[in-house]
Amino acid sequence: MPEGPEIRRAADSLEAAIKGKPLTNAWFAFPQLKSFESSLIGQKVTQIETRGKALLTHFSHNLTLYSHNQLYGVWRVVDAGEHPQTSRILRVRLQTADKAILLYSASDIEMLTPEQLLTHPFLQRVGPDVLDMRLTAEEVKARLLSPKFRNRQFSGLLLDQAFLAGLGNYLRVEILWEVGLAAQRKASQLSEEQLDALSHALLEIPRLSYNTRGVVDDNKHHGALFRFKVFHREGKACERCGGVIERSTLSSRPFYGCPVCQK
C-alpha cells in the first residue's frame, strides 16, 4: 500500500502536468458531478494537496475536488486527447492544452466549497499530514502527549491517520527502529529526550523517504538517503547493535524490529 511519500510524489506529478494551466476539458463519471464540468473550463488547478491518502485538487474559482484512492484508485498523467487502453474504469478527466490527468477506479469523489471543505467528515477525522512542511516537531510532540494519544501503544498509534496522516507500515517500522523504541511503548512512558527524538523522527523519516527514496547517490553518501534499516530484513543483523531483526504481527500488519536495542 502506498504511504504518504508515495502519494505526495504522485500529487507532484499531477501538479507538474496541469498546475496553473487553463482547463480545456473536464469530465466526471458520476452524475452528481456532471454539473461542474462546464464551470471548470478555463479554470486552473492552483494546488494539489495531500491529506493521508486523500487528494484535494484546488481550483482557481475556490472549489476543491476531493478524491480518496481507497484500495484501487489510481491517477495517471497522459497527453491531451490520449485515451489509454485499460480495464480500469475512468472516473475523472481534467485536461489542459497539452496534458490530462485521469483518475481510475476510485469511488469516493466529491466537489467541495470552502465551507464544505472545513466540515468534511474524513478531513475532520484525519490528523495533520507529515509531509505538510508547516507541521513542526513541537506540534507533533503536543499531539503525542495529548489525552487522546498519550496512552496508545505505538504499534497502533503510528497507523492511525487521526494521529498523523501519511504514516503507514514501513514508516512505522523504520521510525521506531530509528529512535530505539519497542512497538508496545507509549508516549506517556517516555523521557523528554525520547519524546523529542520521536517527534523529530515522525517528520524527518517520511520527508527523507519523499525526497530521496530510490535515489542513487554516486558519491555513496548513503547516510543521507532513505533506505530500509529493518523493513523486510528479518533474520539480518541490526545495523546499530548487531542483534537479529525479527518479524512479528502487530495491529494486523507485519512488524520488523530489533529485540535487543528497541526497548
From Swiss-Prot:
A zinc finger (FPG-type) spans 229-263. Binds 1 zinc ion per subunit. The active site is at P2 (schiff-base intermediate with dna), E3 (proton donor), K53 (proton donor), R253 (proton donor). It comes from the Bacteria. Keywords: DNA damage, DNA repair, DNA-binding, Glycosidase, Hydrolase, Lyase, Metal-binding, Multifunctional enzyme, Zinc, Zinc-finger. One of its GO terms (biological process) is base-excision repair. PROSITE patterns: FPG_CAT, ZF_FPG_2. The keyword Repressor does not apply. GO terms for molecular function: class I DNA-(apurinic or apyrimidinic site) endonuclease activity; damaged DNA binding; oxidized pyrimidine nucleobase lesion DNA N-glycosylase activity; zinc ion binding. Belongs to the FPG family. NCBIfam families: PRK10445.1 (NF007763). PANTHER family: ENDONUCLEASE 8. This is Endonuclease 8. It comes from Enterobacter sp. (strain 638).
